[in-house]
């Protein structure tokens, strides 16, 4: 392994030995994030430690296309477990569009750690993709990470904290860069890759834009929200219609500049019923979002259709009395804010 200290990873980012140490560190972070322990964690950390060792062997120096594959053979011959040798072979995957991801969770963790280290490092030294130029295939690497993350199996973690962990490791290695700026660039890079993946999967552009407008940055959360919206539109039209109508009626009149602090003493019975429904929905939607149960969050929002319809049937929002008018608009502002925590429903076509 010490020979890797003579192998340059990238001119401004140091050696492959330093990269290997960061991969191990991030792999440990990912294990903690996903609750991986025991033998599986040991295999992950061992594979992370050894995954670049074959770069100094004659076979890989001569034929770079066999990197990882040769490392797997060497690891097996040295008595490493099957899980470790398989992960070493797989950690470059997916190598190209349509390629399969690593076959095991051990391999996926090492693959993500390697790819994320490369992406963050190159962004830190101003080597991000530009236009059609992507010499380090960072878009493919990011899409590989997002695809693994959103595959719906036992491989789920928050990406933003992992990005933070990588950037902290680079800073600890003495690499100088604007941490906050690079952080935002990398996060936005992954958001864009997630958008591309979902569009390729047939998700409507308006659903993607609606979720983005809610400030969602985590690829897994983003994917689950847009899928829930698309499912409601295609498979549960009644719920989707309730969402659209309830939001639309309130949004047409709301005045954000007034805020949401309405005066309870000015509410009549119908207004009070709506505000009670809003307060209940706020709590239920927040709990559903915390549990990543986005269909439930949409169902809770759709349940507001009845009380808001009754509100508009019985109440003249634009009352001549300015105090009553502004108070009712504040109620509608708060109503719309509940929806905005999930998506910007104003961007959704019916």
Predicted segments with their positions:
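Amphipathic alpha-helical "coupling" segments that flank catalytic cores
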Residues: 1-350
